Regions:
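Bacterial N-terminal signal peptides that target proteins for export
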Residues: 1-12
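N-terminal signal peptide c-region/cleavage motif recognized by signal peptidases
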Residues: 17-18
Length: 256
């Protein structure tokens, strides 16, 4: 046996961590040289079931002050039992504020199926990051459709890793990390949008690369747009409800 390997095995048998040898190696830098103390991460409060203290609360069940209808002349959606509820044919709703890189928490509830509706006709809605990139909302509980259009899909681009849907009329959650695309001054794409999604606490999308804004027909293609744009919620004709909506703007860390 090689002498050094025999020595290390002897240390392991004696219960002496091999990592301690690093502290005895004069050729390695001091431990302090690989430690830094700034910038200090800000302290936030993150209590169970509540929005973090640095979050922007978009809907808490009491008012629609953070929202407005997209369609001109529309009265928008309504609040029913503290839930923001779609009024069919009223059009999309959008946030008054604009967002780019963000962490989004949103809860939704699918309505009870009516008649023999199936596929895309059951509880259809959507959450559009920047008003352009759709995370599908659909009743996909015992309801089949094309996989890149089921609940949790990045619509027509990425199917979810798993189907984590709950039955209709039961509240569900999406937790989203969205990184906006970057464009050069000439409008060319520097980096595409990326997205990670947890559905009811289960990872269903992991840092997927978006091919461009959502398209129902045709293929997605990037076109330069603002660094921040409003979030939109889709009216697709079904009485989908939303609650507890908050967002945290993200500042990406700079590598050391």
């Amino acid at each position: 046996m090689i002498p050094k390997l025999k020595y290390l095995l002897s240390l392991a048998i004696l219960g002496i961590p091999v990592a301690l040898l690093a502290a005895e190696d004069p050729n390695l830098p001091k431990a302090e040289e690989t430690e830094y103390y700034s910038p200090v991460p800000p302290i936030i409060t993150a209590n169970e079931g509540q929005a973090p203290s640095d979050a922007v609360v978009l809907f808490d069940g009491t008012n629609l002050n953070a929202w407005e209808p997209v369609k001109a002349g529309s009265k928008g959606w309504e609040i029913v039992d503290k839930a923001l509820t779609v009024i069919p044919k009223s059009g999309y709703m959008k946030t008054k504020a604009a967002f780019g890189d963000m962490q989004l928490h949103i809860e939704f509830r699918e309505p009870k199926p009516i008649g023999d509706k199936k596929g895309q006709s059951r509880g259809n809605s959507g959450i559009f990051m920047m008003g352009l990139y759709e995370l599908q909302v659909l009743d996909s509980y015992n309801n089949t459709t094309y996989v890149n259009g089921q609940a949790g899909s990045i619509y027509k681009q990425h199917p979810p890793l798993v189907n984590a849907c709950r039955p209709p009329e039961v509240w569900q959650t999406y937790d989203v990390i969205f990184i906006a695309p970057r464009f050069a001054s000439d409008g060319s794409l520097i980096s595409p949008a990326r997205e990670t999604v947890l559905h009811n606490g289960v990872l269903i999308q992991y840092d997927v690369v978006l091919k461009g804004p959502t398209e129902y027909r045709g293929y997605p293609k990037y076109k330069a747009h603002a660094a921040k744009l409003p979030i939109q919620l889709q009216d697709h004709g079904d009485r989908v409800a939303y609650r507890n909506i908050w967002v945290r703007e993200i500042t990406l860390p700079q590598s050391k």
